From Swiss-Prot:
The gene is rpmG. Belongs to the bacterial ribosomal protein bL33 family. GO terms for biological process: translation. GO terms for cellular component: cytoplasm; large ribosomal subunit. Keywords: Ribonucleoprotein, Ribosomal protein. GO terms for molecular function: structural constituent of ribosome. InterPro entries: Ribosomal_bL33 (IPR001705), Ribosomal_bL33_CS (IPR018264), Ribosomal_bL33_sf (IPR038584), Ribosomal_zn-bd (IPR011332). This is Large ribosomal subunit protein bL33.
């Protein structure tokens, strides 16, 4: 049997408040802190900070 994947899907939501999000995989054992990336928000057409939220 195959092993169960330990990675968790998380949602990176734009701090600009536009509702744009990216979905990333994160291993909770090795990456204990929350993710935050500076990525492109296509609604505001700028690079903004994206912070981690759980996928509902």
């Amino acid at each position: 049997m195959a092993k169960k994947n330990k990675n968790v899907l998380v949602r990176l939501v734009s701090t600009a408040g536009t509702g744009v999000f990216w979905v990333k995989k994160r291993n909770p054992k090795t990456q204990t802190e929350k993710l935050s990336f500076r990525k492109y928000d296509k609604v505001v057409r700028k690079h903004v900070l994206f912070k981690e939220e759980k996928i509902k």
